[in-house]
Amino acid sequence: MGWAQLHAAGAGPIVYGHHHVNATDLAAHKRFWANTLGGVPTAFGQSEMYKFPNVHVFVREREPTGGTKGSAVNHIGFRVPSVRAVLGKVRAAGFPVVTRQELPSGMAVIDDMAYIDNQDTYIAFVMAPDNVKVELVEDRDQEEAIALHHIHFDTNDVDAMKAWYVDTFGAIPGTRGSFQAADLPGVNLTYSGNPAALEGTEGRSLDHIGFEVENLEAFCRQLESAGVEFDVPYRELDQLGIAIAFFTDPFGTYIELTEGLDKY
């Protein structure tokens, strides 16, 4: 399997697949996802796609209603061998580094990086175009230049949201540092409590998240029997060789299910 394919595909019946971004400026997003972070640009249907290990980032030209902050998905995370090195690229490209603004005032931030003791790693936050918040997590033993690490949800009910993803997708419950979390092949799903009223993701800069599913048609029937109402029912896109379905989780996250995206 190639560098930028879904490495976790085949590691389980459900793996993480993609992020889908609404963009006001496609060129700016290309500078961020490809030129700065190193995603491999690929044409795909009506969207541009940037391939990273374990995630494809789709970008389409559509005015977003807001950034990731304030929605059910606060940010997305990538792991890198050196946070400092990636921050240098981000600054050189002119994108904002927002580590200090995004962490509690009592947490030490030096050179735009913070050491997280209970995870024994350094992190930083940067802002992609259209206010897509991105966390960088250091993994010094990582051989790849960059790979998907986590999706960080905000929710009014951490326990309920975590349980829903465990029950629905078979994610393995656990923790990540001080956060409640659950794991699927290729991704950590992280949950933070937020008492504020949170917007759904559909229409915002991170419009939806995506999972790659084996036997998708049967899985959709299973979800329907459990009470899930689909915004877009299961259908096959013969021209792309994939199948898709869309629904919204009980907490406002718009979700696409795919089968066949792992071939790209």
Language model feature labels by segment:
Residues A11, G17-F58, R62, A85, ...:
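Core segments of cupin and vicinal oxygen chelate
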Residues A9-G10, E63-T68, R140-Q142, A196-G200:
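Short, flexible, solvent-exposed loop/turn segments with mixed acidic/basic and small polar residues
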Residues M1-A11, I14-T24, M49, G66-F153, T175-R176, A181, ...:
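Vicinal oxygen chelate
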Residues H56-F58, A196-A197, E229, K263:
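Active-site/binding-pocket entry motifs
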